[in-house]
Curated annotation (Swiss-Prot):
A single GO molecular function term of this UniProt record: structural molecule activity
Assigned protein family: Belongs to the archaeal flagellin family.
GO terms of biological process kind: archaeal or bacterial-type flagellum-dependent cell motility
UniProt organism field: Methanococcus voltae
Record's protein name: Flagellin A
InterPro entries: Flagellin/pilin_N_arc, Flagellin_arc
Subcellular compartments: Archaeal flagellum
PANTHER family, A to Z: FLAGELLIN B1
UniProt keyword Ligase, yes or no: no
Length: 219
C-alpha cells in the first residue's frame, strides 16, 4: 500500500515538474519573440530613416538655369547665377549654401548676410544703385555673395532666413573682379546646399566680348 502511494506521489511530482518546465519554455519563447519583434521594428524604423535621408541627399539641391556677367572692359567683374530648387527637392537655405569658383569659396556669414547682401526687389539685376545685394554700389566683398529674390509667393525667402522652395527663384550675386574673367577664360565650380548634391558647372567665356552689350550670358 505504501509502495503504491509512493508511486502515485512520484508521478504527481513528475507531472508538476514537467508542467513547470513547459511553462518556463513558453515564457522563454515569449521573451525571445518579443525581442525579435522589437529588433525587427527597430531595424525597420532605422531602414526607413536611412532611406529618407538617402532620398533627401539624392533629390535635394539647386538647379542653375542661367549665369550672366556684367562687362567692365576688359573683364567681367560681376556675376549673377539664377537658381531654383531642383525637381523634388526640399526647400534650400541659401544662407548655408557654399559656392566654389576657380578655387574660391564664397559663403555669406549669417550676420552680414542678413543686413547687407539681401534684396527683395525684382528690378534690374545689375543695377547696383541702392541694391543691398550689390552692397549699395560699393564693391561686394570677394568672399561673400548676395541674394536677389525673383519669385517667392509664400514669403519664405527673407533676409534672416533666405529659404527657397518649390516654384521660388533667386539670383546669387558675386563680385568676381579678382577672378580675371577675360575672354576665353575657363570658369568652373559648384554650388553645395547644406543637404543634398553638388550642382557643378563649367563655362568657357567667349573668344571676344561684344562691346555693344554690357551683359554676357555664359554658356
Amino acid at each position: 500500500m505504501k509502495v503504491k502511494e509512493f508511486m502515485n506521489n512520484k508521478k504527481g511530482a513528475t507531472g508538476v515538474g514537467t508542467l513547470i518546465v513547459f511553462i518556463a519554455m513558453v515564457l522563454v519563447a515569449a521573451v525571445a519573440a518579443s525581442v525579435l519583434i522589437n529588433t525587427s521594428g527597430f531595424l525597420q524604423q532605422k531602414a526607413s530613416s536611412t532611406g529618407t535621408e538617402s532620398t533627401e541627399q539624392v533629390s535635394t539641391g539647386l538647379k542653375m538655369f542661367q549665369t550672366s556677367g556684367k562687362l567692365n572692359e576688359p573683364i567681367i567683374d560681376r556675376l549673377t547665377i539664377y537658381v531654383t530648387p531642383s525637381p523634388g527637392s526640399k526647400p534650400v537655405d541659401l544662407k548655408n549654401t557654399k559656392l566654389l569658383m576657380n578655387r574660391w569659396t564664397f559663403q555669406p556669414p549669417p550676420v552680414s548676410y542678413s543686413s547687407t547682401y539681401f534684396e527683395n526687389n525684382n528690378k534690374q539685376i545689375f543695377d547696383v544703385t541702392g541694391s543691398k545685394a550689390w552692397n549699395n554700389g560699393a564693391i561686394l566683398p570677394e568672399y561673400n555673395f548676395g541674394v536677389i529674390v525673383i519669385q517667392d509667393d509664400d514669403g519664405s525667402c527673407t533676409a534672416e532666413s533666405p529659404v527657397i522652395g518649390k516654384g521660388d527663384m533667386a539670383v546669387i550675386t558675386i563680385n568676381c573682379t579678382n577672378l580675371d574673367l577675360a575672354p576665353r577664360t575657363r570658369l568652373n565650380g559648384y554650388l553645395q546646399s547644406e543637404i543634398g548634391f553638388k550642382t557643378q558647372f563649367t563655362y568657357i567665356l567667349p573668344n571676344a566680348y561684344d562691346k555693344t552689350e554690357d551683359v554676357v550670358i555664359l554658356q
